[in-house]
């Protein structure tokens, strides 16, 4: 019996449910919370939107609980905020707590709940619009007229205590315009508007926003009529500035046109060109560098090279002990075609290039149309072929015994530079000359001494002939002289007579030469310097002119008359030095 009663109850319920569904009744839809706003962080109000009620009367309730609590509370006031709202008074508002709010819809068919909304009172502040909006036209005597807008802060917002920082936005426009002109202010409750159009009616609205929260609603529109005689802009100053600028521009254009200058030249002057004396820009543009350098050299600039550079350009002349003591290659080796071994010469001294057999043979093969002449210091002449003489600085020396006049071979074979071995008694004292001036003075002294010794005794003539001759037969010597490798002096060459009391060879060693001066043409003037000075100081001659090159690798220099004249003018007169032997 009991089982039958239970089945009957279930059947009846299903019947009623089906009937209600056929009539359109159902549980309510889920409501939606719209927003919660607080006008001043002391109270707040929440609003929701109800869903479909399901054809039945539906009751809505708002429940909440604070973060960290389990106790659920219902809305304290459903009437203050209006329909579908809940108002939280100061008693139920806490600024330091997070609220979890839910809306429930209930009818006979069931219950529906909205999604929870998390609310913090500090971030939901939306103040009321500013109150007491006032518009007024001001006409001050010392300034332009303007529109003065004034308002009051929202009534429910405590601004005086500093609890809020309110920002205001004002917008205005002519009545018939569509775009608003906006202005922003901070903490101020008044604003001045200039540059209004006369005869227009302006509409003004204002709203506010706290530092953390939302903009309030716009206040109701306020309007004001601008009179027709309202000045718009004071353009007199701008007109004066424009006229003054135009006058200045006209004066500048007139000045430029009068002087014939272009505007670009006046504004951007050209870069000044080089102002070097004698510098021609056209030569540089045409690529004529030689003429340009010649023009620069013509100025009073100091010489670009010093004495060291000039000395490096000349060939070093010295007398090597090894060369003098080297034995002459035997006749047997010469006949067998074996060449004598040469010493390893210093490539930097200049002797290596002049001792080269190939270079000497090439120089000796060239015929000399006019052999070099050896003159006295009183009448030196210019070398006719200086390049050949300078190249063969190491050529041997020969002396004519028959005529008792010394002559010098400018070009000779390399094998003639090795003298015969002589006994120690026949060796003359060695000289410690190390430069051109010592060699020249020694050569001049030897020339005079040879002539004197030949006149006195035949024995000295025999020794001189043995020293100078190359060891070959007289026919070979004459043949070499006929081919142009020897240079003889002219018959009219006047030789100075040696002094009667001049010694044969001075045993006093000569030290390194002294550089007297370097002329502007690059001529190097030298004179010897001795270790010991006997007697009064002696004046030395300047040997700066090359006369010829002897066969014994001696460069013969003679005094330059022009250089001596200049020396006499520049320096005080000194006692003439004795003639070197």
Swiss-Prot record:
Comp. bias intervals (Basic and acidic residues): 329-349, 375-384, 469-483
MF-aspect GO terms: cytokine binding; metal ion binding; peptide hormone binding; prolactin receptor activity
User: Among the record's GO biological process terms, what is one?
Assistant: positive regulation of cell population proliferation
User: What CDD domains does the record tag this protein with?
Assistant: FN3
Signal peptide residues are 1-24
Ubl conjugation as a keyword of this entry, yes or no, is no
> Can you say where in the cell this protein is located?
Membrane
Name of this protein: Prolactin receptor
Organism equals Bos taurus
- Gene this chain is encoded by: PRLR
